[in-house]
Amino acid sequence: MSRGAGALQRRTTTYLISLTLVKLESVPPPPPSPSAAAVGAPGARGSEPRDPGSPRGAEEPGKKRHERLFHRQDALWISTSSAGAGGAEPPALSPAPASPARPVSPAPGRRLSLWAAPPGPPLSGGLSPDSKPGGAPSSSRRPLLSSPSWGGPEPEGRTGGGVPGSSSPHPGTGSRRLKVAPPPPAPKPFKTVTTSGAKAGGGKGAGSRLSWPESEGKPRVKGSKSTAGTGASAVAAGGGGSAAVTTSGGVGAGAGARGKLSPRKGKSKTLDNSDLHPGPSAGSPPLTVPAIPVPATSVTAASTQPLGPAPPITLEPPAPGLKRGREGGRASTRDRKMLKFISGIFTKSTGGPPGPGPLPGPQGLSSSSGSRELLGAELRASPKAVVNSQEWTLSRSIPELRLGVLGDVRSGKSSLIHRFLTGSYQVLEKPESEQYKKEMLVDGQTHLVLIREEAGAPDAKFSGWADAVIFVFSLEDESSFQAVSHLHGQLISLRGEGRGGLALALVGTQDRISASSPRVVGDARARALCTDMKRCSYYETCATYGLNVDRVFQEVAQKVVTLRKQQQLLAACKSLPSSPSHSAASTPVAGQASNGGHTSDYSSSLPSSPNVGHRELRAEAAAVAGLSTPGSLHRAAKRRTSLFANRRGSDSEKRSLDSRGETTGSGRAIPIKQSFLLKRSGNSLNKEWKKKYVTLSSNGFLLYHPSINDYIHSTHGKEMDLLRTTVKVPGKRPPRAISAFGPSASINGLVKDMSTVQMGEGPEASTPMPSPSPSPSSLQLPTDQTSKHLLKPDRNLARALSTDCTPSGDLSPLSREPPPSPMVKKQRRKKLSTPSKTEGSAVQAEAKRKMWKLKSFGSLRNIYKAEENFEFLIVSSTGQTWHFEAASFEERDAWVQAIESQILASLQCCESSKVKLRTDSQSEAVAIQAIRNAKGNSTCVDCGAPNPTWASLNLGALICIECSGIHRNLGTHLSRVRSLDLDDWPRELTLVLTAIGNDTANRVWESDTRGRAKPTRDSSREERESWIRAKYEQLLFLAPLGTTEEPLGRQLWAAVEAQDVAAVLLLLAHARHGPLDTSVEDPQLRSPLHLAAELAHVVITQLLLWYGADVAARDAQGRTALFYARQAGSQLCADILLQHGCPGEGGSTATTPSAATTPSITATPSPRRRSSAASLGRVDTTIALV
């Protein structure tokens, strides 16, 4: 075996060197003919075929077994043995002159045949460089197909000869193909090619070059072309003729005339140059091709050219002998590597990714992997909408926006989504739920929008998943409009009212509106529903031509991003390190006391450090859960001087009290920070410090109460809006200010140990100064650093030096004096002012300060007491100040930081004019466009000028700029003029103008002109003014009332009850002639305003108030219209009534469930502000002024 291995290695080297110079050819045994007999070949004794049933390993004695140089299922057999008993030594590999090509005419009855090399004696002929086509080699050699399979033109001189039935094992780039072409002289249209899975000569068949191992198959996919699958034998079909192909363990295709399958012309791509030899296909023996067995479910076929019509392909299970032939014919690793190297010389793989491809053509066969390729190609060609993608489960680096779409089947939501995703319109009514995704750019950042279209009602999973929900209905379908209201109710019931962060949008689709199906849902009804849904925007879209489609999704995504930022800001405010509210949030309110209700003093309610006691607070909160009597807290009045000095309470008492204070206040705004502080007003005459329970709420308000009991019961409390305030610390520079004198050696401006402060420069500056004890008999106070800096002429510099600067020796002539006390003492009760210029020196100022301290504290002992002052101020925009003092500077800094955070949050929630213009420009444009779209609003109501830009609110009409000046002269009781472009348009004003319009207004105010000519756009101002005054002031053209004799009050009640806006406007116009008797025979003595508020009709409510309805009118139970508006759940009606000075609801609202659940408007200010002007101008009776 070792000698055979040496011969193998040597033969390999020789073969590689002569690879480019030698052309190897295999010639099948020719039919018995005189011409064939003349061309003999040595080794004819080995030409007898072996018995097909004889095993491969059963070799005759004296014959050495052949060893293969290469094996790749179709490798060429090369003898590596020396001459034995039955064989001759193969000749050396030397080039031979090519003989002229000669056509071969096989016998009609003979069929083209290919068989593997038998294990007989070695070939005596060896590897001939150029065997003649008509030669008769020994039958012990395995003939190879030499028919050209590349489809290109054949080389010159090779058109007539060749080996019968030869074919290239490399028909295409990355694929394997067997092609049987008819001979050029007389092709036959139909032939039968039969392939078997094993060698005919034995049960352990050798490998064939027409089938490659699975691990080495490298098919490619390029464009519409596909390549052969792994382990599959493909037979390509040409353009003319066809053939039935039967394969075992592979898939074949019909074969016909030769087609162009490769761009490489005249070049050999096989080991033996057999692809350059044409061969006949008629009368040839059957082809026997060993193939790798593959499952029937994973059969693939490939072709580099579309196939013509062909009969169906028959798949057969692999023969048993094929598997044994594969297993017995495996080559070594070295042989396989060598074969890969040789194959790479003649074939050049494409750059496509490896993978099986589907079979093109009419056969339509594809494997599971081929189906995946087809699916992948279809998805790549489709738009960005992908259904059931893994994007719903995998994490991404870009943020997500989860958007849900709800609506009826006929709402048009599927067409809306399809238009947004693809940009094209398609009538879709999907009865099942779908999922989509698309990338969007929001605030300059890419977001992945996950769209979930729900076919039915939302469930709990959907309500928790969605960041925004779009409710879609069709403007021509009443049922879809009603379904939206039910869907919204179900969503709110699942998600809850209190859970914020959900952006809502209501969309009315115009896709189905036509002459046969007109619009049935008016704009006023849709906007009223949008108002009831709260924090909802209304849009009208048309997916047919894309009106507002992209805008809906863009604005909803923008709203989601804005809400997320606000939630993050609030979460940051709530997670302040100094607020212990989250540590004891689960403690019940009922169990709040401290050892029978006794507390020592103020110091017992404050932790000594904001970082201590969070873990212990949770344990102590459980300890006090069973105690009661919350009203007994702080009953005893304590001396102010002992609040911070005497700490008689234990740590457990302090923590339990602190935990109680943090858990109170259920049912109101979320408290961010709360504790006891000292408070005094800076503007009142009473300068005495009082202990208050101070609470900082998440809505931007600071509340303080005399006791915790008052806070629990919401009595005797004051609050201030932090939007209009700022917080300051006395003697401390503003944040971000950089000191010009270097870093401070003190802690928050207070030097703890003077012995460690460097009092000068140079070598002696590093020596600690001694600290002599204070002398009680002397009135000379210690020259502390605060007093020295405050005595400087520049007050700002003094403030900076007192807090942020390290004192140096040259700042003051007194700076080098040794301090008599180791502790620096700050003033506590009175702010020091800058000394006047008339004062002689700083010593006089110091003497005054000492005398004031002596008078205030009563003794010199208290002057040198180590007592610290931790004060901060809240200053309003009106100049009012509130002084608060904490127990430590850590607590003070925590309060200052929390208040600054809330001020920032309030300012960010409050929209300035520019921000409002940018964010609300599109929504305002929609409102203005809706006003312009009202009937008759394209021209001026008085002169007919086109495109009016001004409006009269109480008339409900649009006017031009020339007529607007005349309307202003009439007075606001007749005409309230507003610009469409320059003024803001609240929701209620937009509803009024869209509900009336110029057409309705002229039918009321200009019904009978009495032959008078109406002015035109070219009329003079005098003509316009005369017409306008006659029309609105003198009521000359007013439409008459009906023939009914009912009082105007009853007619107005009936019109309000019928919600007839035009009739209400006409009756209100006639009521100007005299007082309007609104008394009706109503058992509850309600007025039309009560009825309008009960019906939640915003337009009629606004018109009644403009035309003089009594906003303070009460019914039999003493309830005003505000009660009915809140009972109906109409926030807009309630806002309108409050703007016109409507008093409280009146009566008892506890018996009305809807009124009890309706949020109060005046009790707790809303944390969200629509505009800065509205926030600064609001009036609240609970705001503290002192």
Swiss-Prot record:
Gene3D superfamilies: Ankyrin repeat-containing domain (1.25.40.20), Arf GTPase activating protein (1.10.220.150), P-loop containing nucleotide triphosphate hydrolases (3.40.50.300), Pleckstrin-homology domain (PH domain)/Phosphotyrosine-binding domain (PTB) (2.30.29.30). Keywords: ANK repeat, Cytoplasm, GTP-binding, GTPase activation, Metal-binding, Nucleotide-binding, Nucleus, Phosphoprotein, Repeat, Zinc, Zinc-finger. Residues 180-225 are annotated as: Interactions with HOMER1 and NF2. GAP activity is stimulated by phosphatidylinositol 4,5-bisphosphate (PIP2) and, to a lesser extent, by phosphatidylinositol 3,4,5-trisphosphate (PIP3). Phosphatidic acid potentiates PIP2 stimulation. The modification Phosphoserine is found at S113, S128, S149, S632, S744, S746, S802, S921, S979, S1172. SUPFAM superfamilies: Ankyrin repeat, ArfGap/RecO-like zinc finger, P-loop containing nucleoside triphosphate hydrolases, PH domain-like. Residues 925-1045 form the Arf-GAP domain. GO terms for cellular component: cytoplasm; cytosol; dendrite; endosome; external side of plasma membrane; Flemming body; glutamatergic synapse; membrane. Pfam families: Ank_2 (PF12796), ArfGap (PF01412), Ras (PF00071). It is found in: Cytoplasm; Nucleus. GTP binds at residues 407-414, 451-455, 509-512. InterPro entries: Ankyrin_rpt, Ankyrin_rpt-contain_sf, Arf-GAP_GTPase_ANK_PH, ARFGAP/RecO, ArfGAP_dom, ArfGAP_dom_sf, P-loop_NTPase, PH-like_dom_sf. Residues 399-566 are annotated as: G domain. GTPase-activating protein (GAP) for ARF1 and ARF5, which also shows strong GTPase activity. Participates in the prevention of neuronal apoptosis by enhancing PI3 kinase activity. Aids the coupling of metabotropic glutamate receptor 1 (GRM1) to cytoplasmic PI3 kinase by interacting with Homer scaffolding proteins, and also seems to mediate anti-apoptotic effects of NGF by activating nuclear PI3 kinase. This is Arf-GAP with GTPase, ANK repeat and PH domain-containing protein 2. It comes from Rattus norvegicus (Rat). The lineage of its organism: Eukaryota, Metazoa, Chordata, Craniata, Vertebrata.
